[in-house]
Curated annotation (Swiss-Prot):
Gene Ontology, cellular component aspect: plasma membrane
Family classification: Belongs to the MgtC/SapB family.
InterPro entries: MgtC/SapB/SrpB/YhiD_fam, MgtC_SapB_SrpB_YhiD_N
Transmembrane intervals: 11-31, 43-63, 73-93, 116-136
Highest taxon, organism lineage: Bacteria
Organism: Synechococcus elongatus (strain ATCC 33912 / PCC 7942 / FACHB-805) (Anacystis nidulans R2)
PANTHER family: MAGNESIUM TRANSPORTER YHID-RELATED, PROTEIN MGTC
Membrane topology: Multi-pass membrane protein
Name this protein carries in UniProt: Protein SrpB
UniProt keyword annotation of Cell membrane present: yes
Keywords of the record: Cell membrane, Membrane, Plasmid, Stress response, Transmembrane, Transmembrane helix
Description of what induces expression: By sulfur deprivation.
A Pfam family reported for this protein in Swiss-Prot or TrEMBL: MgtC
Length: 182
């Protein structure tokens, strides 16, 4: 049996896909909301559920030809990816540089935009019935959002520590290093 296609009237299967897409979106959204990001739990839940709904329409409208349904599904997934890309683009902001010396503008919202995009993909995957892949993708998304942030903090602390040591080495008087020889 094909995993993607459900028998007509399988409301339990359809409900499971929608509910799981909602849960995945809510979990990712909660992660973003706790970090004070511009898009939160409701936004991510709606994106995941909307993507699942969009891909479920051609799946349910299979009709006589599964080839036609797969073709329609392919176009639907492309449309969802492009549409959500525009939604994410609205979250990306370009601001004035922190200092005039750097001259480079600050960009914010990229991670939120990318997270909305991946949440739409997860909703589409779950809507297609590939819920195991959706859960694995959710795990790796949360790992990226939470785990990589910790790694960045550790790297930043290490850099700061190295800068402090280098600064102290420059500010020590020249004979301070020789006093320890006694």
């Amino acid at each position: 049996m094909n995993v993607i296609f459900l028998p007509q009237g399988d409301w339990l299967g359809l409900s499971f896909r929608l509910l799981l897409a909602m849960l995945v979106g809510a979990v990712i959204g909660l992660n973003r909301q706790r970090g004070g990001r511009p898009a939160g739990m409701r936004t991510f839940t709606l994106v995941a559920m909307g993507s699942a709904l969009f891909v479920m329409v051609p799946i349910q409208a299979e009709g006589d030809s599964s080839f036609a349904a797969i073709n329609a599904l392919s176009r639907t997934v492309q449309g969802v990816a492009a549409g959500v890309g525009f939604l994410g683009a609205g979250l990306i902001l370009q601001r004035a540089p922190k200092t005039k010396r750097s001259g480079r503008p600050r960009v914010s919202g990229l991670t939120t935009a990318a997270t909305i995009w991946i949440t739409a993909a997860l909703g589409a995957v779950i809507g297609c019935g590939l819920w195991q892949l959706g859960l694995i993708g959710t795990f790796f998304t949360l790992l990226t959002l939470s785990g990589f942030k910790r790694l960045q903090r550790i790297a930043w602390l290490r850099q700061s520590w190295e800068r402090l040591i280098a600064w102290e080495a420059k500010t020590l008087p020249p004979d301070a290093e020789e006093e320890d020889d006694d």
